[in-house]
Amino acid sequence: MCTYRRIGYEILAAPNEEKQTVNAIFDSESYLPVYEKDLMQARKSIYIASPGLNKNKVRRLIALVEEQQSAGVIVTVITQPAESYLQTRVEPTKALQTALTAAGIFVVPQPDLHTHFAVIDQEIVWYGSTNLLSRDKEDDGLMRIGSRDVALELLEEIGR
């Protein structure tokens, strides 16, 4: 964490409600309100790379972005194909992917996806170990970066 501080990041234990902090590091307990606010303030596009899918997180995403989609925001989820899961998880994962598609969210299967990030309006980047559409782990963390260059580089990596 000291290295991140030296290059301009600050660690947030409790997010500031008034101003969205850019170039900050969040833990699994502090990121959600700021991340969700970013999703709800999207004006053009949302890309979420999440290898895993969880029913509660998928439902929450669908509800959060419904208004933005009505205003023309394109939402895309990049995730592993359902067939790459254990046999017992294939059908539940297909159902979650179908729910996303039915809600107007583009689902892009990408085999061997292991990165976790979100890019909002090609400007705000959330990047780290947190699987944004699956379960949070206690030691997960995310960086929130305001950088068009980083956003475009991540989108290029996934072919967008």
What is each model feature region?
Residues M1-Y4:
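Conserved SF2 helicase motif VI
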Residues S28, K55-V58, V107:
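A conditional alpha-helix N-cap/helix-loop micro-motif detector
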